[in-house]
Amino acid sequence: MSDSAVATSASPVIVQAASGEKKVSTKKAAATPKSKKSTAAPPSHPPTQQMVDASIKNLKERGGSSLLAIKKYIGATYKCDAQKLAPFIKKYLKNAVANGKLIQTKGKGASGSFKLSRSAKKDAKPKASAVEKKTKKVNASAAAATKRSSSTSTTKKAAGAADKKLSKSAAAKKNVEKKKADKEKAKDAKKTGTIKAKLTTAKAKSSATKPKTPKPKTTSAKPKKVVSATTPKKTAVKKPKAKTASATKK
């Protein structure tokens, strides 16, 4: 009896320890989903209220927009799974009809057609205008940035073009100067050539005009005629003068 009593008293202690281990494991398992929730990515689309209001407003159907049309618009514009969001969309439609934000033109519950009420339209306009202002500001800032970048690029291009033009003009000036120098050299060479030619022609002319120095003639001296003394010179014979009358009278 004593042995059985000891065995029965010991068994509950073991069971309690096992239950304590189970509790610890369940606590750890419960702690892990919290970390998963914290790491979950935020949704890439706005809340269902804004999406439904925007879809009804942009569809602009006279008889109201149906649930299918709203789903299609949300899936196309916001690129999300409209089937998963269907229960949230239905819930919002019912609450909006009850609050007076939406008007149900057809059907009952969430299966009919819906339109925005006047108060909802008034409320939606300032929100839309604020969004438009923000988008305009963003677009203006982006346009200014693009203008700045384009202006900087144009200034850089203009500077590069100006540098290229300057380099081209400098090269052209150098070429012109070289050509001028070559022409001047050619002119100088021509001048020097003409001067040399003139000098040579002048020398030739001077040499042609200079009288030639007569060379001494080496003629043999001819023997002079020697007049012999024996040959008497011919004397002029004087004719007798005519006797005058006085002489005749004697």
Curated annotation (Swiss-Prot):
One of its GO terms (molecular function) is double-stranded DNA binding. The keyword Iron does not apply. It comes from the Eukaryota. Residues 235-250 have a biased composition (Basic residues). Residues 17-53, 104-250 are annotated as: Disordered. CDD domains: H15. Residues 44-118 form the H15 domain. It is found in: Nucleus; Chromosome. Keywords: Chromosome, DNA-binding, Nucleus. GO terms for cellular component: nucleosome; nucleus. Residues 120-133, 174-191 have a biased composition (Basic and acidic residues). Residues 27-42, 138-161, 192-234 have a biased composition (Low complexity). PROSITE patterns: H15 (PS51504). Gene3D superfamilies: Winged helix-like DNA-binding domain superfamily/Winged helix DNA-binding domain. Histones H1 are necessary for the condensation of nucleosome chains into higher-order structures. Belongs to the histone H1/H5 family. This is Histone H1.3.
